[in-house]
């Protein structure tokens, strides 16, 4: 049975576009080969320049057995409280990376995330859009 979901809001699409543009700018300037943390700080700078609120290394609590637990999960970047960015600097995106961002989306009750791998020749090829019901 196919489920029908509401489309992604225009505001969320706008934030996704800003995020993709920021990743392009960072990658164009620095290229591949650096640590994730470097790309993360540079992405935060791009968001600040664009006047977009973003938080980094935001804790994701886990509700288990009716108890809110600190499981040491952290979202790389949360853009305007709505869009999750998971940044990587790996040779290849693995299924576990996609599972990670899907889990973050579910645990935080958010719909859209971007999985961005900076260790690619062309950033477009390293950017994956993940939509969660």
Predicted segments, located by residue:
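Solvent-exposed, charged helical/coil patches
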Residues: 1-53, 124, 129-133
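Residues at secondary-structure transition points
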Residues: 10, 14, 34, 38, ...
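Conserved catalytic cores of phosphodiester-cleaving nucleases, focusing on short active-site segments
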Residues: 31, 54, 75-93, 104
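Short connector loops at helix/strand junctions that flank enzyme active sites
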Residues: 42, 49, 55, 70-74, ...
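A short acidic/basic microdomain associated with nuclease active sites
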Residues: 48-65
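A structural signal for short, well-ordered beta-strand segments
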Residues: 58-60, 75-77, 127
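Acidic pyrophosphate-coordinating catalytic loop
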Residues: 64-68, 123-124
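Nucleic-acid nuclease catalytic cores
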Residues: 88-133
């Amino acid at each position: 049975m196919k489920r029908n979901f509401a489309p992604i809001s225009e505001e969320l699409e706008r934030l996704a576009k800003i995020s993709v543009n920021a990743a392009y700018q960072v990658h164009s300037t620095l290229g591949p080969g650096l640590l994730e943390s470097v790309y993360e700080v540079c992405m935060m700078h791009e968001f600040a320049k664009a006047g977009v609120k973003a938080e980094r290394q935001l804790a994701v609590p886990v509700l288990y057995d009716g108890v809110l637990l600190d499981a040491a999960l952290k979202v790389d970047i949360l853009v305007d409280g709505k869009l999750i960015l998971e940044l990587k600097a790996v040779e290849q995106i693995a299924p576990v990376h996609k599972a990670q961002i899907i889990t973050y989306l579910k645990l935080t009750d958010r719909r859209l995330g971007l999985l961005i791998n900076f260790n690619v020749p062309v950033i477009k090829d390293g950017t994956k859009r993940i939509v969660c019901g």
